[in-house]
């Protein structure tokens, strides 16, 4: 990524060497011995992170302020299920999490089989719930942040137009080929 994304000043490139790891092959599972962030405490959170991170530009909490960040999602505004959580100022975490002290209703994903890679199904589903409640305009609370997290403005526009995940992904194919 350092070369491909142009991270070095003056369009410099660095010479990179891939060193094969003995006894490991692509596809082998691996569990990090140390959590990469207080908000990514386990393999489940790490696996769900790509799909849940874009919620940070919306009215939906990703569970910051709980002991299960990026494993629970919800909002005080909707009641998708009886599952609820209450973000609080926990030691070693954000002192002011979204919806601090309020019950959020949504999904417990702690034992859910996470999608392989990035999925828009959760974002699309929650957006549709807000739209059904007549609150579509309240869903993207930080639209520029959402756009930055997903890489462009087009995805947000496609979601608000009612496109399916498959239709949105199809638009990426040309760029991937």
Descriptions of predicted regions:
Residues 68-173:
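Conserved functional hotspot residues or short segments at active or partner-binding sites
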Residues 1-3:
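Internal gly/pro-rich beta-alpha loop/helix module
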Residues 11-17, 21-100:
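Glycine-rich, aromatic-lined ligand/substrate-binding cores of catalytic
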